């Protein structure tokens, strides 16, 4: 995805990060950096180089809460996409409401991501999304 954006007009305004997310967020907080929007696609599970364990079910609320401190005075949106069965869209909605929504108000939407199965009119669940946006 980053190669596509680098060729587009927005290439100079978007940063793609592959890093330990919580460590990155803490560094950005210390530096005083602010963001108008955050788009995240955190993994369901991961291990750090020193054996640290990341589990979306356990760590997502902390990550979103800390990221809220990175938002500018008038943020535009906060989007989370996750391919997991361990967190429901209702839980994601509640996390956004208790963090970003509590600080900035705005509108929150959350739901399931799915792939349509056309031959029997079903949807294969693939994950969840949650979006906070300024009203």
Language-model segments: which ranges?
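A short helix-to-beta-strand connector/capping loop
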Residues: 9-14, 104-106
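Mobile active-site "lid"/loop adjacent to the S-adenosyl-L-methionine
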Residues: 11, 18, 35-66
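General small-molecule cofactor/ligand-binding pocket signal
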Residues: 15-17, 111
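Conserved SAM/SAH-binding loop
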Residues: 18-24
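A short acidic, Gly/Pro-enriched loop at the edge of an enzyme's catalytic core
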Residues: 26-37
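Helix-to-beta-strand junctions that scaffold the AdoMet/dcAdoMet cofactor pocket
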Residues: 71-73
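C-terminal catalytic and target-recognition region of SAM-dependent MTase-like enzymes
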Residues: 75-135
């Amino acid at each position: 995805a980053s190669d596509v954006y680098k060729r587009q007009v927005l290439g100079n305004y978007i940063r793609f990060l592959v890093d330990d997310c919580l460590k990155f967020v803490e560094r950005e907080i210390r530096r005083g950096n602010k963001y108008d929007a955050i788009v995240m696609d955190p993994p369901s599970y991961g291990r750090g180089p020193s054996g640290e364990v990341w589990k979306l079910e356990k760590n997502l609320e902390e990550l979103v809460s800390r990221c809220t401190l990175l938002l500018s005075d008038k943020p535009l949106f906060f989007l989370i996409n996750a391919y997991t069965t361990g967190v429901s869209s209702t839980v994601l909605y509640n996390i956004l409401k208790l963090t970003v929504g509590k600080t900035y108000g705005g509108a929150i939407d959350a739901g399931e991501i799915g792939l349509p199965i056309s031959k029997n009119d079903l949807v294969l669940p693939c994950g969840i999304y949650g979006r906070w946006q300024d009203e």
